[in-house]
Amino acid sequence: MSRRVEFDMSHEDHTDRRRTNTFSSEEDGVPNEVADYLVYFSRMIDEQNVPEILTLYDQAFPDLTERFFRDRMWPDENVVERIIGPGNKLFIILYKELYYRQLYARNARGPLLVHRYESFMNYQELFSELLSSKDPIPLSLPNVWLWDIIDEFVYQFQAFCLYKANPGKRNADEVEDLINIEENQNAWNIYPVLNILYSLLSKSQIVEQLKALKEKRNPDSVADEFGQSDLYFKLGYFALIGLLRTHVLLGDYHQALKTVQYVDIDPKGIYNTVPTCLVTLHYFVGFSHLMMRNYGEATKMFVNCLLYIQRTKTVQSQQPSKKNFQYDVIGKTWDQLFYLLAICLAVQPQRIDESIASQLAERCGERMMHMANGNVDEFRNAFSTGCPKFLSPTTVVYEGVNQSKEPLLRQTQSFLEGIESQMALPVLRGYLKLYTTLPTKKLASFMDVDEENYDSFLGKLLTYKMIVNELGKEAGPSTVDDDEPQTDIDFYVDRDMINIADTKVARHVGEHFLRHIQKLQEVQDVLKRLDSAGQKP
């Protein structure tokens, strides 16, 4: 039984509002409770009452959907306009954004082409209102709704690209309409999608502001009235992460990381207020590092994200029933992260959080053992399970074979080429752990390397050394609070002799607690000074 959400409305107020329009509960088939909700929702948008908007969006909408619209759609825009009255263009646009999002969520095969087209036109109208205004729009929305707008926009673009590459997703009547859309390039084309996201960045000056913050400068010094607007700043921030995701789906990992180079991946970031945003950021940054063979940084991102999901698992378990109209990022990504983490640790073993390590061993222990022994099929299966749904924005198939999986096959091949070039590394590491000194010729014989391939073998040895060294290079904030090495082995080559050092050290639990006791004492001292300052007359 879903919990009903009550609205603090004046009966006289909302009745008067509905007397001025042509709404009829019997004719339009809309329950009075839903009509009251829409009137109140519209009023809260006008008043910019963010806490109340959050309740109406986050709790009331799913609650009413569960009770009244399990088997049918919410009323269309014309009925809603008769309920709330004319002159509420912005609310109608926002309502339609929710309407189409629910339409996508409840259709396993995806909505009809006409609904995909109408949804894009509604997004275009929304962003046009925001971007073409001479002054910042007087609109305040909760962080989670702002993120959901950007996230759903990118998701629907991805869904359209997969739809037009798969003839099995549409009926015969839609082919002609799709031909017309593609010829005119007026819906879900890559260029307007990227243009909208980059325009949000430009309008909000988000990159300049984040760069200023990173350089310890005042962000207001590089921002105009749009950049200083809370609405535009947050939309620009979330658009950065939307662009990160888009570039990864297109296979441009360097540009993806460049897009978020000034985003401070810190627990106190804006994205932390929206769990799905935090998970999206860490997943796609980590995946970009993995595809660029920076396995150490990828591991940090994946472990950080898994720890966050683990800590908030109780809350997140309530999300599907609470937001049944949303794309459940967290639930799906939880499994994907383990497969990607298994790949990273099979190629480049390192110490990670013990709770995550135990779950990883339970889920993927046997798979990792096969990968460490050079089983290419295990790498392929883990990658296919953990990767996102890649897309090709220019591929259109009007009839014939489904080509929506072609981008996945290309990215899988690219990934495996990188893995195959390093396939010997896990085996190499296994031999090095057995010795403190080892002649290069002897190691080569262990690995069945003949004289002709000896030079290339030395190259692989140097490659492994570079991977070990790479762990010391911080591309982001450290996930550990000590200086312990992340790998359990290090070595150097002196002429024809390999010198190996076991870098695995015992964890100094006592020192860990002492450090945090000191930090706690410092915080308490600051609080005492603030308290004494506040009590002064």
Curated annotation (Swiss-Prot):
Keyword DNA damage: no
Biased composition (Basic and acidic residues): 1-19
Pfam families, per the entry: Paf67
One Gene Ontology term, aspect cellular component: eukaryotic translation initiation factor 3 complex
One example of a Gene Ontology biological process annotation: formation of cytoplasmic translation initiation complex
A GO molecular-function annotation: translation initiation factor activity
Chain ranges of the PCI domain: 297-485
Entry's family note: Belongs to the eIF-3 subunit L family.
Protein name: Eukaryotic translation initiation factor 3 subunit L
Taxonomic placement: Eukaryota, Metazoa, Ecdysozoa, Nematoda, Chromadorea
